[in-house]
Amino acid sequence: MNTVGTPLLWGGFAVVVTIMLAIDLLLQGRRGAHAMTMKQAAAWSLVWVTLSLLFNAAFWWYLVQTEGRAVADPQALAFLTGYLIEKSLAVDNVFVWLMLFSYFSVPAALQRRVLVYGVLGAIVLRTIMIFTGSWLISQFDWILYIFGAFLLFTGVKMALAHEDESGIGDKPLVRWLRGHLRMTDTIDNEHFFVRKNGLLYATPLMLVLILVELSDVIFAVDSIPAIFAVTTDPFIVLTSNLFAILGLRAMYFLLAGVAERFSMLKYGLAVILVFIGIKMLIVDFYHIPIAVSLGVVFGILVMTFIINAWVNYRHDKQRVE
């Protein structure tokens, strides 16, 4: 697997992520079982975005010193594009978490605890998936066409899909988990497991954590191939992906109260997936530059938010009338 990642870059990335996670977990422990406020969520979202941009700037500077601008510019642009793609697709993941917490009636104070472990699990699972994907691409380059076709199909499916939280409990996976886990009927404070009559029982909070992890894996199956359309370098794919999901918990609490105001977002994300799928399928006939890909993705997101704002304005105006 060809990569610009050197031991220094890998080590620096690991140190930054470890320190930030330790600070985040330390603050989580001090606050106890309290919901993250909108102000805290906004502050942490800003921290993670700023840290990601600073890392990319340091990454660019390092490559300029060691490889020159000819290498540094496209690699830093690839990181930024991958980060933007993952960050935008992660919003849909956040809305699924909101549905899960709503269906299982998880209090806001406990949602934070679930998401702490959910994000930690996502880091491990996505790291495994990215290195596996990089190895597969290095051995079988035709697999990019499979990724492209899959993203094209997923984009169309996303645009046509209708989410309904009322049917979550009837999903085969949920029924299977409930049937194979010794589980209590109610949430017991912040515990994932409790003992009753000498037996260990999982609480509904554990079921929610499992579903949060599985939902992230499902979304990673979309987002990781999308970043491989930009670059196959495992260092850039992994760092851009993980920096994007590290801020997911803060993003959740930032958007949780206004989820219904983003009704048009899934269509914008669907267009992004279709574009990336087509980009991967035509790569042998026409190579779309990274700068163009970044511009297209950013442009789609801007147009989506403009349309969304217009739709919300129309709805609010109709309510007043």
Curated annotation (Swiss-Prot):
Membrane topology annotation: Multi-pass membrane protein
All ranges on the Cytoplasmic side of the membrane: 28-43, 111-113, 157-198, 247-261, 308-321
Pfam families in UniProt: TerC
A GO CC term attached to the entry: plasma membrane
Membrane-crossing segments per the record: 7-27, 44-64, 90-110, 114-134, 136-156, 199-219, 226-246, 262-282, 287-307
Ranges facing Periplasmic side: 1-6, 65-89, 135, 220-225, 283-286
UniProtKB keywords: Cell inner membrane, Cell membrane, Membrane, Transmembrane, Transmembrane helix
Top-level taxon in the UniProt lineage: Bacteria
Compartment annotation: Cell inner membrane
PANTHER family in the cross-refs: MEMBRANE BOUND PREDICTED REDOX MODULATOR, THYLAKOID MEMBRANE PROTEIN TERC, CHLOROPLASTIC
Family the entry assigns: Belongs to the TerC family.
Function: Has been proposed to be a redox modulator.
Name of the protein this chain belongs to: Putative membrane-bound redox modulator Alx
Species whose genome carries this gene: Escherichia coli O6:H1 (strain CFT073 / ATCC 700928 / UPEC)
